């Protein structure tokens, strides 16, 4: 199910950003210009991340899955960003604590049922250290999914 929402123009490998806002601004330019979302999606993501952080500390690596603002999604998508240098984001399980995120999956879905199904599959996928290692190496995302 995940493959059908992942597009080549939304895969960003070995990128450098100073922080989450810098990353979000860059990815949003692509999402808006390619008609995946309306510009308001950015504000919705920032707000949601403040209230309900999406950073997950797993076994030896950290991942974030920012999502939200379904009313601004024009075309359902999953965007993958691997980072040259980790960025600080707050933890999902302890919002007051930050962690260094290596990989980010930004997702946008117009329907909550699709959103929940894909989020569940993504959560299962990211718990496999081999998958994360392959993504960091730049292995084809579609072969990993």
Map each language-model feature to its residues:
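Cytosolic covalent-transfer regions centered on His/Cys nucleophiles
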Residues: 1-145
């Amino acid at each position: 199910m995940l493959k059908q929402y992942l597009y080549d123009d939304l895969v960003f490998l070995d990128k450098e950003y100073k922080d989450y806002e810098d990353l979000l601004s860059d990815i949003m330019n692509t999402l808006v210009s390619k008609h995946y979302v309306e510009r308001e999606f950015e504000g919705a993501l920032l707000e949601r991340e403040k209230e309900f952080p999406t950073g997950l500390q797993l076994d030896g690596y950290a991942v974030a899955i920012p999502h939200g603002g379904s009313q601004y999604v024009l075309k359902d998508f999953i965007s993958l960003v691997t980072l040259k240098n980790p960025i600080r984001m707050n933890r999902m399980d302890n919002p007051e604590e930050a962690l260094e995120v290596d990989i980010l999956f930004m997702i946008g879905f117009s329907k909550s049922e699709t959103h929940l199904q894909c989020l569940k599959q993504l959560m299962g996928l990211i718990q496999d250290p081999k998958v994360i290692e392959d993504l960091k190496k730049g292995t084809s995302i579609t072969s990993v999914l």
